[in-house]
């Protein structure tokens, strides 16, 4: 190997170039030997993956277990809200609050909830008989203790000019029934049975009372409707597989019965399928629990795996036909597996970072762990199982066997004597091949379309201005969408869209969004409640809220009773002996914790209830309330915490859910920068960074405009977008920067001709496979469909429209290749002239 120093080039440039050449050729040599090994032992590399799939696949069926804790999956794992819940629960145990109206403070436990909605224009308050019948039927249910804790009104119309806010009419009533399970396993089973019967009863009552609309919710409803997505999607996933199999088979076919590879397209998709089954088996063997977010793994793995399949097929077509099939396999591996190894490594790095301890959402972490295993197995199965299939197909081609019927192809003379239909079925393309076209694979319909039609059109000088305008429009909409990103802390985004939970949530949002959930305000340190300055501080903290406070009620009681309690002993004495013994104030006993030291009593902790006035965007406003109250707990003299069960899901959710994609993006950027001087041409990495950034921001902005929130599913799709873009842009870009044609236009044509077929095959199969997801009635699958559709569409747009045009404007320049060729041609002409002068007879003979 010889390296010539370019005039004026520094020595470091020579060493970097040598290092890049050595690394590249080393990787190519390794992949070449790997291809030779597979071609010499195809049975072994076919058998081992099959045995692994059977072993782990059977174990997956035996160990399948769904995840039952939805909060563990989708709520931030490490949040202040969980610490606050523990503190609140230790101060005020849940079983002491079941008889309270405002008891939904720590965690609801087991409960049943129903909304009764009157027809449009009617007053629910006039439907008393139906309400009482529903309530009475619930109270008569057995197998569990219950307590009626009250009702709330929705869609309220007040009496005009009423000072005491009297209610004129209402559209809906909400009733909640709490069960006392006390943490016992037996009681919990009884509570679960009661909830099931409760939901059945509400459905039955709906049939009996057509004049009312009933919407029920129980504590297990969210988990049930979350898991329902997987049940609804089973048949659609199978349809997706059939569509991908069909697309891969058809796109791998040719008229040439010898060189057509329909079964290889089919076997390539099946290779990815069995690798996914093996990964699932490993997941369940390691005590993993299934959840509906894992529904995206087959689509993610298929998008990467089939890319390797189609690239290997394209690499096979680029090899020389006159070589033995084993050498052709080795050459295809040397050509394709270097890039595929790099992209698989980036998949592993990005999803590995998503599975790191920095990820605060358990569903994202579990998904990324499974994706890492799937990528490793995918890579192993592609070069082993599919490689063995390619070996057998190559052997059949070398021995001139039909690619479908596996019979000997007759000679041209024999075919000429047969009917046209027989010639069509058994033709190996000998009539189409001419001395001008030595590569029969050029007749593949996609490659023919790209070479003869598309390449000339996209590089036309009159098309380029329209492509630039198209990209500016694309960038504008993407930027506009990126400015409107909203977090997806609403758990409804992960549920089946036609489920009872979603119906209940929609009605609740419509009629009960005027007030926030009840927020517990916990004072966890002793406080001088009798001090006027402390009283003023409490009033300022509670200003802007509707407060249900024992402190305020006690102050009013003292004022009405004309009793003075300006010191500690009087304040506590009157509180215990008079205030808390009155029937209308007895429910405040559970809100105050007393301690006794000798004859002296102290208040060591207490709680108040706050309700905020909200609008339709209830969730966002509650998050703002939480963010405003927490800093006050540190800056004020009163030490307190605020808590509601919804805080567990909303606490820094936007930060928790965006961290994985930021880490993954940083990982990709870091890897590409670190390898900037190790790849064969640094400009390849530079263009790759720009392309991936453009695609990622495009998907992010467009999905926001398509009403997709930043929940755990969309974040996983954004991580996948990084890798999907690299997977498809990297071969195209590196082929372009290494091309030695005279002009950039010729280089991009050559790149599209080499890799355009594989890219188009894979993206088309990927997008067609997404179509059945559109028919799954689930918000989770809608999000998955939208994000992956944008991922495939933006990648296709960049590979076939934007990059082919922009690469003709910007570096790398191809002039030095042109100068080298001119110098060589001039040198050759001088040598020929010398030969002509010295040997004129020879020239005359020629």
Curated annotation (Swiss-Prot):
Description of what induces expression: Induced by TP53.
Segments traversing the membrane: 41-61, 230-250, 265-285, 293-313, 336-356, 373-393, 465-485, 660-680, 686-706, 718-738, 765-785, 787-807
Compartment list: Membrane
Location, primary (coarse class): membrane
All copies of domain SSD, residue ranges: 233-392
GO cellular component terms attached to this protein's record: membrane
PROSITE patterns per UniProt: SSD
Superkingdom assignment: Eukaryota
Residues linked to a glycan: 762
UniProtKB keywords: Glycoprotein, Membrane, Transmembrane, Transmembrane helix
A Pfam family the protein falls into: Patched
Membrane topology of the entry: Multi-pass membrane protein
Family indicated by similarity: Belongs to the patched family.
Protein purpose: Could act as a repressor of canonical hedgehog signaling by antagonizing the effects of SMO, as suggested by down-regulation of hedgehog target genes, including GLI1, PTCH1, and PTCH2 in PTCHD4-expressing cells.
Designated name of the protein: Patched domain-containing protein 4
């Amino acid at each position: 190997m010889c390296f010539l120093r370019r005039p004026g080039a520094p020595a470091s440039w020579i060493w970097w170039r040598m290092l890049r050449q050595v690394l590249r050729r080393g990787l190519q040599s390794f992949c070449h030997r790997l291809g030779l090994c597979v071609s010499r032992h195809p049975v072994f590399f076919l058998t081992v993956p099959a045995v692994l799939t059977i072993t782990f696949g059977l174990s997956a069926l035996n160990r399948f277990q769904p995840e039952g804790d939805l909060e563990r999956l989708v709520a931030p794992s490490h949040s202040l809200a969980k610490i606050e819940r523990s503190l609140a629960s230790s101060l005020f145990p849940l079983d002491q609050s079941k008889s309270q109206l405002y008891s939904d403070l720590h965690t609801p436990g087991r409960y049943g909830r129903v909304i009764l909605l009157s027809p449009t224009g009617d007053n629910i308050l006039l439907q008393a008989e139906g309400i009482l019948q529903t309530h009475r039927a619930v109270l008569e249910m057995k197998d569990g203790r219950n307590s009626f804790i009250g009702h709330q009104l929705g869609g309220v119309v007040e009496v005009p000019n009423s000072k005491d806010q009297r209610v004129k009419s209402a559209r809906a009533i909400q009733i909640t029934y709490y069960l006392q399970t006390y943490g016992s396993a037996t009681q919990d089973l009884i509570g679960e049975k009661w909830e099931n019967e409760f939901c059945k009863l509400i459905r039955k009552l709906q049939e009996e009372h057509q004049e009312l609309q009933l919407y029920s919710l129980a504590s297990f409803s969210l988990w049930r409707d979350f898991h329902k997505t997987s049940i609804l999607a089973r048949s659609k996933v199978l349809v997706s597989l059939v569509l991908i199999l069909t697309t891969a088979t058809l796109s791998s076919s040719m008229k040439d019965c010898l060189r057509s590879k329909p079964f290889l397209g089919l076997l390539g998709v099946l290779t990815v399928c069995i690798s996914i089954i093996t990964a699932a088996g490993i997941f369940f063997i390691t005590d993993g629990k299934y959840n509906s977010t894992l529904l995206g793994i087959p689509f993610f793995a298929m998008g990467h795996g089939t890319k390797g399949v189609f690239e290997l097929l394209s690499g096979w077509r680029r090899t020389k036909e006159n070589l033995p099939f084993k050498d052709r396999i080795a050459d295809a591996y040397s050509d394709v597996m270097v890039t595929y190894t790099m992209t698989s490594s980036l998949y592993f790095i990005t999803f590995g970072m998503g599975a790191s301890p920095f990820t605060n959402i358990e569903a994202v972490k579990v998904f990324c762990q499974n994706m890492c295993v799937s990528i490793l197995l995918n890579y192993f199965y592609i070069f082993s199982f599919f490689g063995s299939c390619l070996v057998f197909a190559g052997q059949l081609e070398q021995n001139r066997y039909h690619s479908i019927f596996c019979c000997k192809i007759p000679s041209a003379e024999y075919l000429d004597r047969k009917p046209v239909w027989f010639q069509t079925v058994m033709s190996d393309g000998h009539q189409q091949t001419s001395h001008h076209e030595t590569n029969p694979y050029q007749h593949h319909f996609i490659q023919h379309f790209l070479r003869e039609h598309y390449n000339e059109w996209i590089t036309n000088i009159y098309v380029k201005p329209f492509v630039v305008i198209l990209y500016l429009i694309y960038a504008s909409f993407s930027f506009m969408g990126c400015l409107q990103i909203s977090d997806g802390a609403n758990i409804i985004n992960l549920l089946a869209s036609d489920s009872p939970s979603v119906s209940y949530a929609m009605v609740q949002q419509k009629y009960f969004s005027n007030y926030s959930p009840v927020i517990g305000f916990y004072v966890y340190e002793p406080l001088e409640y009798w001090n006027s300055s402390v009283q003023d501080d409490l009033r300022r903290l509670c200003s802007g809220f509707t407060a249900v406070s024992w402190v305020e009620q006690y102050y009013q009681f003292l004022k009405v009773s004309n009793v003075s309690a300006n010191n500690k002993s009087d304040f506590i004495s009157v509180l215990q002996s008079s205030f808390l013994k009155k029937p209308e104030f007895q429910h405040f006993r559970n809100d105050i914790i007393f301690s006794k030291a000798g004859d002296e009593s102290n208040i060591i902790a207490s709680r108040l209830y706050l309700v905020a006035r909200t609008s339709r965007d209830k969730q966002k406003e509650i998050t703002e309330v939480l963010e405003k109250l927490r800093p006050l707990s540190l800056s004020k003299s009163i030490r307190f915490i605020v808590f509601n069960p919804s805080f567990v899901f909303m606490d820094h959710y936007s930060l928790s859910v965006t961290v994985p994609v930021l880490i993954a993006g940083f990982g990709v950027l870091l890897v590409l920068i670190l390898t900037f001087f190790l790849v064969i041409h640094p400009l390849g990495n530079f263009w790759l960074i720009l392309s991936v950034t453009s695609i990622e921001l495009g998907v992010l902005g467009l999905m926001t405009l398509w009403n997709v929130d930043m929940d755990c599913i969309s974040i996983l799709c954004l991580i996948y977008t990084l890798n999907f873009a690299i997977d498809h842009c990297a071969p195209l870009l590196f082929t372009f920067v290494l091309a030695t044609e005279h002009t950039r236009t010729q280089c991009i044509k050559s790149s599209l001709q080499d890799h355009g077929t594989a890219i188009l095959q894979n993206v088309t199969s990927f997008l067609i496979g997404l179509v059945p997801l559109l028919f799954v009635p689930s918000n989770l699958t809608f999000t998955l469909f939208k994000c992956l559709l944008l991922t495939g569409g933006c990648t296709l747009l960049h590979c076939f429209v934007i990059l082919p045009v922009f690469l003709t404007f910007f570096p790398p320049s191809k002039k030095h290749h042109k100068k080298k060729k001119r110098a060589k041609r001039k040198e050759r002409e001088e040598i020929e002239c010398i030969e002509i002068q010295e040997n004129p007879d020879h020239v005359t003979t020629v």
